[in-house]
A protein has these predicted regions:
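Short beta-strand element of the alpha/beta-hydrolase
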Residues: 49-58
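Alpha/beta-hydrolase fold nucleophile elbow
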Residues: 146-159
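Alpha/beta-hydrolase active-site loop signature
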Residues: 60, 114-118, 184-185
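Alpha/beta-hydrolase-fold serine-hydrolase catalytic core, especially in secreted/extracellular enzymes
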Residues: 2-25, 30-35, 173, 249-263, ...
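Conserved alpha/beta-hydrolase
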Residues: 99, 103-119
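A short loop-to-beta-strand scaffold at the N-terminal edge of the catalytic core in hydrolase folds
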Residues: 33-43, 52
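Accessory cap/linker subdomain of secreted extracellular hydrolases
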Residues: 62-66, 70-88, 92-99, 104, ...
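Alpha/beta-hydrolase active-site loop
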Residues: 93-94, 104, 126-146
Length: 372
């Protein structure tokens, strides 16, 4: 473990130079209420000013993709050998970018553990207004660091897409572009109450299996990271009673708040009239039980003058990592974060992968959505 070597690090932070990157682990970001979140910063070894790709969420920034979703990673790698190629895969993390494929292109990748999750203390309150504020603060923190060019982009799947809508509506100064990849926006309709009927299974199973399992304070009772050998949900270890006191029970909250007009839901809805940032909204035809409505609604209802819609098929996570998805993301962010004249402004506003029999997808370009 290397010692800290940056002014923004503290006694819990450390830095490594390996695999062509400088990695600053457990860097503190202080929130306006005093809570200190922890992030990992993957950046080029050479000092410079770079565009920033950021995510904030509850799945544990130290937790390797393979440590909890091995079957998904193996299947994706077998179907698309390009995904595990040209990278050691040491830093693969569920539903966020692989820094080994972004840092060489002169980006800084910042992963933040959300309040109460992973390495960040506090109380978990899933998709709350407080969490959206935290993300906005993190964006503006990243925008003024010595390695930043002042332009921050948000990019990630599912949870890491959903809170992009909320953050964009808060309009942090340094937010330059977003790419919500398969991300719901209306948690009442898209997740908890389909057609007004409570969805008992998902909210309970998902929150317990994917969020509370890596809650901050599980410490030595949780996962040990293969990335750096430290505890995913450390450094402290709390009792089950203490852990319970440090989270709002998402399932019980969903059950108790039965109407979409309840403050619990309205406080989690983005104000579309304030979502003005350039966006690439990427949906999946096959995820109708959760995410795609958010991507379509976000594209249609936001007031951004620079917005694109892309729709694809197959699994929920796969195309985010394939050459197809990476090409879209990198061209989009290069244009808006780095100022590259790469022709993105001529990209069709709507790009659809239309499904045909035999698992065949045919690309189709359109000028608007809904189609006319």
């Amino acid at each position: 473990m290397a010692k800290k070597n940056s002014s923004y690090m503290d006694d819990q932070s450390w830095s490594d130079v390996r695999d062509g990157m400088r990695i600053d682990w457990d860097v503190p970001i202080k929130m306006d209420d005093g809570v200190v979140l922890r992030c990992d910063v993957y950046r080029p070894i050479k000092n410079g000013k770079y565009g920033v790709i950021m995510t904030l969420g509850p799945y544990g920034k130290f937790l390797h993709f393979n440590e909890i979703y091995e079957d998904q990673f193996v299947r994706m790698s077998e179907d698309f050998p390009e995904v595990p190629s040209e990278t050691t895969n040491k830093y693969q993390n569920w539903e966020v970018v692989d820094p080994e494929k972004w840092v060489p292109d002169d980006y800084v990748c910042v992963r933040v553990d959300s309040r109460g999750a992973g390495r960040s203390p506090g109380v978990i309150d899933i998709w709350s207004g407080r969490e959206a504020q935290d993300l906005a603060i993190c964006v503006d923190w990243a925008g003024v660091q010595s390695w930043s060019n002042g332009k921050v982009g948000l990019n990630g799947i599912s949870y890491y897409a959903e809170n992009q809508w909320q953050c964009a509506a808060l309009q942090p100064k340094h937010l330059a572009a977003i790419c919500p990849w398969e991300g719901a926006a209306d948690y009442y309709r898209d997740m908890a109450h389909h057609g007004g009927i409570f969805c008992n299974g998902f909210t309970k199973v998902w929150s317990e299996a994917q969020v509370y399992s890596v809650q901050h304070g599980r410490g030595t009772n949780g996962f040990r990271s293969s990335m750096n050998g430290d505890w995913v949900s450390g450094p402290i270890t709390l009792t089950e009673e203490e852990l319970g006191a440090n989270r709002n029970n998402f399932y019980e909250d969903c059950l108790a708040n039965k109407l979409d007009t309840d403050e619990f839901w309205t406080s989690r809805m983005p104000d579309w009239s304030k979502v003005k940032v350039p966006m690439l909204s990427s949906a999946n035809w096959g995820g109708q039980g959760l995410h795609p409505r958010g991507n379509f609604e976000g594209f249609v209802r936001s007031v951004s003058k620079n917005k694109w819609l892309e729709v694809h098929g197959i699994e929920h996570w796969t195309h985010f990592y394939t050459n197809y998805g990476m090409d879209l993301q990198k061209r989009f962010f290069a244009y808006f974060l780095k100022g590259e004249k790469n022709g993105w402004n001529k990209q069709p506003k709507v790009q659809l992968q239309v499904r045909h029999p035999g698992e065949k997808f045919v690309e189709r370009h359109e000028k608007e959505w809904p189609l006319k």
